[in-house]
């Protein structure tokens, strides 16, 4: 019996975390307080570093508003979800057209995509914490703020006496 209850709790926790992705995609910031715990906190490497600690649903609202200004057509696609205890892990892909300031770079009009991993802590049927790790290097490469891995390998292999080998072609 307790095993069934636990499975139901895990599925409920997954649904709560997935609801946050729906709120993001639907631009339903009015629903953030329904999904986020009053003591919500965000931490980790995010696409937008918060101005101070990200505490409370209002802080996440501000983060999403900045996100929508930079990438008005931003969408998140959930690629995987796993739950254990009060934790839910989401692997997702973000993407959209870079129209406003993002990572300090003005809009380029280019489409950008990157992956992120969220570890959500669920309490009282709401998201208490979002510990996120964003692939900031992928974003920086696409915005021209960092060289791509292929560019680095080509530069290293052109140095006389370098033992670095070029990366295989992406066309394989």
Residue ranges of model-derived segments:
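C-terminal and inter-domain tail/linker signature
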Residues: 1-172
């Amino acid at each position: 019996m307790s095993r069934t209850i636990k499975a139901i709790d895990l599925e409920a926790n997954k649904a709560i975390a997935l609801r946050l992705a729906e709120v993001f995609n639907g631009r339903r910031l009015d629903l953030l307080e329904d999904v986020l715990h009053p003591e919500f906190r965000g931490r980790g490497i995010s696409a937008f570093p918060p101005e101070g600690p990200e505490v409370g649903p209002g802080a996440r609202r501000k983060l999403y508003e900045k996100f929508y200004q930079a990438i008005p057509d931003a969408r998140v696609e959930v690629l995987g979800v796993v739950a254990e205890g009060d934790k839910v892990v989401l692997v997702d892909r973000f993407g959209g057209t870079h129209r406003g300031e993002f990572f300090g770079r003005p809009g380029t009009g280019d489409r950008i995509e990157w992956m992120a991993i969220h570890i959500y802590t669920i309490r009282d049927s709401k998201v208490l914490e979002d510990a996120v790790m964003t692939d900031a290097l992928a974003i920086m490469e696409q915005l021209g703020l960092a060289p791509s891995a292929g560019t680095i390998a080509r530069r290293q292999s052109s140095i006389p006496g370098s033992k670095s080998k070029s990366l295989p072609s992406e066309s394989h």
